[in-house]
Amino acid sequence: IRKQPHVGVAFFFDGACEEGVVHESMNLASSMKLPMLFVVENNLFSSHLDIHLRQPGNRVARFAEAHAIATEVVDGNDVLAVADAAARLVARARRGDGPGFIEAVTYRWLGHVGADANIDVGVRRSVREVALWKKRDPIARLEVALSTERGIEPAQFGNIRGRVENIVE
């Protein structure tokens, strides 16, 4: 609208895709070719229910596709894959080609409320399932990628972690 290089970004979870306001927002963004990036963290649970109990499929990118929005489905536990997808879709939005949508597929390690590893209303996940996802820890995977692909020495990660913790506090 203002013809500036800015791109609006909205982060939300898979359960929000079941709300009308999300579809209204995507429809408006697509119709007006707004420079917008929708980022959905699909952790496979909405509040207390597995996605398979709420939807006919486990991917939510189909909702954006219905609004003619460019979509990318990525491994949400791969920080670099998410960053690469965001860079592509932001560049597209800045060119005036309309909004983009990232579905970052990940997993919620803990319950919706509190620190219980199980879902809060009696749904129990197997220990094996949770353990498999924990092996895909995005921070540990990023450290491996940065050391093998970007040449960052493993000894530097302690300093990086400390700086990040200071920023977060």
List the predicted regions and their residue ranges.
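Glycine-rich ThDP/TPP pyrophosphate-binding loop and its adjacent helix/strand module
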Residues: 1-168
